[in-house]
Amino acid sequence: MTRISRSAYAEIYGPTVVGGVGDRVRLADTLLLAEVEKDHTIFGEEVKFGGGKVIRDGMGQSQRLATDCVDTVITNALIIDAVTGIVKADIGIKDGLISGIGKAGNPDTQPGVTIIIGASTEVVAGEGLIVTAGAIDTHIHFICPQQIEEALATGTTTMIGGGTGPATGSLATTSTSGPWHMAAMLQALDAFPVNVGLFGKGSSSSHGALLEQVRAGAMGLKIHEDWASTPASIDTCLNVAEETDIQVAIHSDTLNESGFVEDTFAAFKGRTIHSFHTEGAGGGHAPDIIRAAGMPNVLPASTNPTMPFTRNTIDEHLDMVMVCHHLDPSIAEDLAFAESRIRRETIAAEDILHDLGAFSIMSSDSQAMGRVGEIVLRTWQTAHKMKLQRGPLQGDSERSDNERIKRYIAKYTINPAVAHGIAHLVGSVEVGKLADLVLWKPAFFGVKVNMVLKSGMAVSASIGDMGASISTPQPVQIRPMWGSHGKALRTSVAFVSQVSLSNPAVSELELNKRLEAVRGCRGVTKHDMVRNNWLPAISVDPQTYQVYADGQLLRCEALAELPMAQRYFLF
């Protein structure tokens, strides 16, 4: 038997597992090391495309018809996923869905083939690359359409939120108000290669005013203090959600005008709700909205400007609050409102609560106190910071960080999908789900994508000079691909409510995107948050703002330097 060294094998086919010991891959320039847990490959039967390689007719490529073969195969990829784990495999894609995770090839010449390659199969070389599920951002202010190109370039394939453009209401709140705006925005978003979902305005104590937005195509409702986050509006909104099986997101009452945090919790009546920026700098009862992260019916999220806690975090937030919420720095009350939201102690505690799995979701808050292109990046910066300051998680070691890696990737993939009733289609690298996949070079993981697939078709990729003789000459830039154009936009989905599918006005919009109803939103609890379901008793000292979880003080220092930062963005 011919043998090659482990390092030579990794160079050719990517990392593997030998003798129960997995190769390790560093994520970007962080301290995080991913160790391969399983390899579906049969040594000596690997498939690879190219001159003199295996995927040729009669070798790794079969003579079977398209019905038996995958449309696309990603070969020898390292999957990093909260559900599937950290595994090496070939990935088969058929009719826009992940059809297989296993061993690709020609079953007529090779053993153990679970993914059949034929003349109808395209190949994406995954050797040496990491594959993840596309990120799901549940806090999008749809202010400008250029956000979508930025989001795709950093691995986001599903954008959920609200807005109508740079209108004053949309600059502050993630809601698309009323049936007319709902229809117009669904039609506008039909031109972009991302999955979308819109929140209606949930700040109303009128049952009918909320229901008509859900019937118009809202996949959820958003309660926001700038429109009113009162106990009456919360109760009414949750009543409508219970009737129509949609999710409710909340930005609660910073000023405690209509009640304190206990009154808001009482208005929930044990019903499920998605709490935005649960730390509070992005908005919510001052100073103790962070207590919501310990409630079983609350699905707690962060927005990315507070993540992780650095020496610049506090300083940049004051101006963000003033601009976002239409405040006037010359008015003392407006300034006091902004300052009440920014607390060093709760921001520091947020990092630790993420690391322990009490915070379940990461999102952006795009252009409204958040950066649409940094949801993935800031998640991994936080994981790095916590390893640096707190050491390995339980189940990890100095050798690898698999448990921490799987916990953190869940925050922007499977958990937002579960929270909003779309996990049957997106959120993980699993058979049967949309092939919304992101390929990364390990050195650029979480920073700059290599390629983004929507339903198996490339929509964004790092590509060189389009006038050059090959695809790699500089400048290499992340650019839209064919899947971003024409009727290929049907590879994306518009998520709506189930009741809207029977509304003739919605079908008359004649969208290219296929409409998919959200489902199972009302039965979700914190226990369903994958790898992020810790329920501590959280308290906040009203004088010092110090945060305690199960009686333990949560404290960490701000970092002065982060990975995934300047060295990647000088050019």
UniProtKB/Swiss-Prot annotation:
<keyword id="KW-0378">Hydrolase</keyword>
<dbReference type="InterPro" id="IPR006680">
    <property type="entry name" value="Amidohydro-rel"/>
</dbReference>
<dbReference type="GO" id="GO:0016151">
    <property type="term" value="F:nickel cation binding"/>
</dbReference>
<feature type="binding site">
    <location>
        <position position="139"/>
    </location>
    <ligand>
        <name>Ni(2+) 1</name>
    </ligand>
</feature>
<feature type="binding site">
    <location>
        <position position="224"/>
    </location>
    <ligand>
        <name>substrate</name>
    </ligand>
</feature>
<feature type="modified residue" description="N6-carboxylysine">
    <location>
        <position position="222"/>
    </location>
</feature>
<feature type="domain" description="Urease">
    <location>
        <begin position="134"/>
        <end position="571"/>
    </location>
</feature>
<dbReference type="InterPro" id="IPR017951">
    <property type="entry name" value="Urease_asu_c"/>
</dbReference>
<dbReference type="InterPro" id="IPR005848">
    <property type="entry name" value="Urease_asu"/>
</dbReference>
<comment type="similarity">
    <text>Belongs to the metallo-dependent hydrolases superfamily. Urease alpha subunit family.</text>
</comment>
<feature type="binding site">
    <location>
        <position position="141"/>
    </location>
    <ligand>
        <name>Ni(2+) 1</name>
    </ligand>
</feature>
<comment type="pathway">
    <text>Nitrogen metabolism; urea degradation; CO(2) and NH(3) from urea (urease route): step 1/1.</text>
</comment>
<feature type="binding site" description="via carbamate group">
    <location>
        <position position="222"/>
    </location>
    <ligand>
        <name>Ni(2+) 2</name>
    </ligand>
</feature>
<dbReference type="InterPro" id="IPR011612">
    <property type="entry name" value="Urease_alpha_N_dom"/>
</dbReference>
<dbReference type="InterPro" id="IPR017950">
    <property type="entry name" value="Urease_AS"/>
</dbReference>
<comment type="subunit">
    <text>Heterotrimer of UreA (gamma), UreB (beta) and UreC (alpha) subunits. Three heterotrimers associate to form the active enzyme.</text>
</comment>
<feature type="binding site" description="via carbamate group">
    <location>
        <position position="222"/>
    </location>
    <ligand>
        <name>Ni(2+) 1</name>
    </ligand>
</feature>
<dbReference type="Pfam" id="PF00449">
    <property type="entry name" value="Urease_alpha"/>
</dbReference>
<keyword id="KW-0963">Cytoplasm</keyword>
<protein>
    <recommendedName>
        <fullName>Urease subunit alpha</fullName>
        <ecNumber>3.5.1.5</ecNumber>
    </recommendedName>
</protein>
<feature type="active site" description="Proton donor">
    <location>
        <position position="325"/>
    </location>
</feature>
<keyword id="KW-0479">Metal-binding</keyword>
<dbReference type="GO" id="GO:0009039">
    <property type="term" value="F:urease activity"/>
</dbReference>
<feature type="binding site">
    <location>
        <position position="251"/>
    </location>
    <ligand>
        <name>Ni(2+) 2</name>
    </ligand>
</feature>
<dbReference type="InterPro" id="IPR029754">
    <property type="entry name" value="Urease_Ni-bd"/>
</dbReference>
<dbReference type="InterPro" id="IPR032466">
    <property type="entry name" value="Metal_Hydrolase"/>
</dbReference>
<dbReference type="GO" id="GO:0005737">
    <property type="term" value="C:cytoplasm"/>
</dbReference>
<feature type="binding site">
    <location>
        <position position="365"/>
    </location>
    <ligand>
        <name>Ni(2+) 1</name>
    </ligand>
</feature>
<dbReference type="InterPro" id="IPR050112">
    <property type="entry name" value="Urease_alpha_subunit"/>
</dbReference>
<dbReference type="GO" id="GO:0043419">
    <property type="term" value="P:urea catabolic process"/>
</dbReference>
<dbReference type="Pfam" id="PF01979">
    <property type="entry name" value="Amidohydro_1"/>
</dbReference>
<feature type="binding site">
    <location>
        <position position="277"/>
    </location>
    <ligand>
        <name>Ni(2+) 2</name>
    </ligand>
</feature>
<dbReference type="InterPro" id="IPR011059">
    <property type="entry name" value="Metal-dep_hydrolase_composite"/>
</dbReference>
<keyword id="KW-0533">Nickel</keyword>
